[in-house]
């Protein structure tokens, strides 16, 4: 059944019904069917229902692996020395990117985001930065919350960080399928492509195949991923869930699950105990397809293993 966004989605006050003018082209609706699971698993149907790429020279669009300090210790995104450790770890591992999540604008303890980007560039590691989508934040007093939703501010910010050498952006908290927010996705991707920025859409809707038109879109969350493992009931069902999503969610597009977590995630002081094996976690790095494969655990968790 085709449904409009829920009225209860309060992020933006817009009506749930879309508005347009004629000629009006409605989206494709597709069903993927195959005689075997491999046919479904390997399909690119959703991508192929989109217009061809508008990016001429795409040699700068490179998939890769990333480290990420936020999952285990959120406050570390503001700590310069911690982020430098992650850059060094990436360099040693041969991973291409490091993601600095929310809070990097207030970085201290010896340096700034700009300093991390410069150092990472010398090590051959590309830096990604987190941004709020701006959904529902038009009147927010925090200016950084509007950097992606306001076209003028967005382009200025993208130009600024591109000049610094930032390689990608993770845009988060879209939080609704109302028309204005759906239209924000291609607007962000288009501007990001102009400034040679890769994109991860987090807290976002189910993939729509935008990556064919804008191949700088590397991945989309839209999955109950590792961020939810702070609850024991999620850990208890993780093995079953992880064995299912390659044939459901991952079929329609790259999946930002943030896998390979060996540590027990602590939420409000209470650890949720991992119920999957080390082998299971390692397999997720291969089984889950994502152009930006962000490994979520702390450095020590990876270094402690053989």
For the regions a language model picked out, list residue spans one by one.
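Glycine-rich, aromatic-lined ligand/substrate-binding cores of catalytic
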Residues: 265-306
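Aromatic- and carboxylate-enriched substrate-binding clefts and catalytic-loop regions
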Residues: 101-267, 271-275
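Conserved mixed alpha/beta catalytic, RNA-binding, or beta-rich assembly cores of soluble enzyme
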Residues: 38-43, 48, 54-58, 75-77
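Catalytic domains of carbohydrate-active enzymes, especially glycoside hydrolases
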Residues: 80-103, 160-167
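N-terminal accessory beta-strand-rich subdomains and adjacent acidic, glycine-rich linkers
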Residues: 1-47
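Feature activates predominantly on carbohydrate-active enzymes
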Residues: 48-69, 91-96
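Active-site mouth loops of central-metabolism enzymes
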Residues: 65-82, 139-153
């Amino acid at each position: 059944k085709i449904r409009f966004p829920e009225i209860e989605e309060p992020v933006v006050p817009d009506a749930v019904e879309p508005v347009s003018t004629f000629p009006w082209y409605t989206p494709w609706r597709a069903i993927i069917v195959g005689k075997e699971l491999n046919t479904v698993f390997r399909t690119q149907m959703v991508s192929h229902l989109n217009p061809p790429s508008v990016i001429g020279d795409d040699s700068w669009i490179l998939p890769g692996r990333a480290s990420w300090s936020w999952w285990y210790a959120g406050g570390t995104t503001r700590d310069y020395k911690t982020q430098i450790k992650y850059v060094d770890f990436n360099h040693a591992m041969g991973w291409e990117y490091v993601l600095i999540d929310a809070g990097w604008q207030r970085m201290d303890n010896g340096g700034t985001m700009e300093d991390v980007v410069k150092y990472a560039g010398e090590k051959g590691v590309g830096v990604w930065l987190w941004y709020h989508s701006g959904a529902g934040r038009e009147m927010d007093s925090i200016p950084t919350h509007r950097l992606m939703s306001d076209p003028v501010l967005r382009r200025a910010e993208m130009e600024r960080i591109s000049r610094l050498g930032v390689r990608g952006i993770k845009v988060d908290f879209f939080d609704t399928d109302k028309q204005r927010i759906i239209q924000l996705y291609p607007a962000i991707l288009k501007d990001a492509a102009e400034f040679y920025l890769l994109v991860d859409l987090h807290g976002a809707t189910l993939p729509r195949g935008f990556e064919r038109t804008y191949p700088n879109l590397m991945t989309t969350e839209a999955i109950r991923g590792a961020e939810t493992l702070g609850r024991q009931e999620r850990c208890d069902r993780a093995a079953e869930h992880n064995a299912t999503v390659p044939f459901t969610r991952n079929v329609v597009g790259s999946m930002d699950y943030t896998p390979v977590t060996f540590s027990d995630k602590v939420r409000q002081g209470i650890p949720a105990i991992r119920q999957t094996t080390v082998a299971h976690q390692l397999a997720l790095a291969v089984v889950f397809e994502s152009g930006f494969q962000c490994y979520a655990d702390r450095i020590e968790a990876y270094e402690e293993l053989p």
